[in-house]
């Protein structure tokens, strides 16, 4: 079984335009058309059983629309997180609605949403997500949308669980996209989950393997950041790390099943 914990897709009407825009910003190719149908086609071809969709509310006004879309496409193959914007006046109400919609967690992107992960004004958001048992997946490290400032540095991410010990926190991109030294220093060995998305493009194999060993297979999630990377690319990297069958199963699906309450 294979669960990709970090997938992006969009409504059919805007998928092509959105991917072209993001591709120009990131100077990165994409590997699906960004629609539900083409993402499922890609998953079938790649051997991905379940994709965990991670939408981003880039504006406060987008919360409800994005979460309604996520709820409308959710099925046994696509399990969706919702998203809230920290600056929205109704952010707390929307967290409760995410739970009511049957979505599986909350995606936050500090760079797109223009906040720092340790900003005090996020306290109620973290506290409410913890109380509702909603996992949070954070973009961490570099992002081309704000190249001059890393809004989710590993050191700040590592501090969040100290205040919210029951919050399930997932740091995308090995804890810091293109900022792996600090991720290794501050996040590796913590109780924060780390997803491996985009590691095949940017993370040195020796460092990747070292981080996997030191963090532990029970806190690592297989992920791609589809459509910006593929399951084949990330699996080729993972396969170069000497893991037991149990450890690989944990990374490829077991930890995800636990977070998603599928076990």
Where are these regions (language model features)?
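A general structural detector for well-ordered alpha-helical segments in enzyme core domains, enriched
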Residues: 38-42, 66-73, 94-98, 121-125, ...
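Catalytic pocket-lining loop regions of alpha/beta-barrel enzymes
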Residues: 104-105, 118-221
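Active-site gating/metal-coordination segments in enzymes
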Residues: 49-50, 60-144, 148-151, 202
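Active-site neighborhood of phospho(di)ester-bond hydrolases with catalytic His/Asp-centered motifs
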Residues: 2-5, 53-54, 81-82, 107, ...
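Mid-to-C-terminal alpha-helical segments outside catalytic/metal-binding sites
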Residues: 1-8, 14-50, 214-219, 232-263
């Amino acid at each position: 079984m294979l669960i990709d914990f970090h997938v992006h897709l969009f409504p059919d009407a805007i998928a092509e335009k959105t991917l072209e825009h993001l591709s120009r910003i990131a100077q990165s190719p994409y590997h699906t058309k960004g629609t539900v149908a083409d993402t499922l086609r890609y998953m079938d071809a790649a051997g991905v059983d379940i994709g965990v969709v991670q939408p981003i509310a880039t504006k406060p006004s987008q919360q409800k629309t994005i979460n309604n879309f996520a709820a409308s496409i959710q099925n046994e193959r696509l399990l969706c997180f919702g998203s809230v914007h920290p600056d929205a006046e109704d952010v707390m109400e929307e967290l409760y609605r995410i739970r009511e919609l049957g979505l599986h967690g909350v995606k936050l992107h500090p760079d797109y949403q223009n906040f720092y992960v340790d900003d005090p004004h996020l306290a109620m958001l973290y506290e409410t997500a913890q109380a509702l048992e909603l996992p949070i997946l954070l973009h961490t490290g570099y992002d081309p949308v704000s190249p001059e400032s890393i809004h989710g540095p590993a050191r700040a991410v590592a501090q969040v669980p100290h205040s919210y010990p029951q919050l399930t926190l997932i740091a995308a991109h090995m804890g810091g996209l293109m900022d792996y030294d600090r991720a290794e220093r501050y996040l590796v060995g913590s109780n924060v989950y780390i997803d491996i998305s985009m590691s095949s493009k940017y993370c040195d194999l020796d460092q990747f393997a070292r981080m996997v060993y030191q963090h532990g297979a029970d806190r690592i999630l297989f992920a791609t950041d589809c459509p910006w990377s593929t399951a084949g690319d990330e699996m080729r990297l993972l396969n170069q790390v000497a893991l037991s069958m149990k450890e690989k199963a944990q990374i490829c699906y077991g930890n995800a099943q636990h977070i998603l309450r599928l076990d």
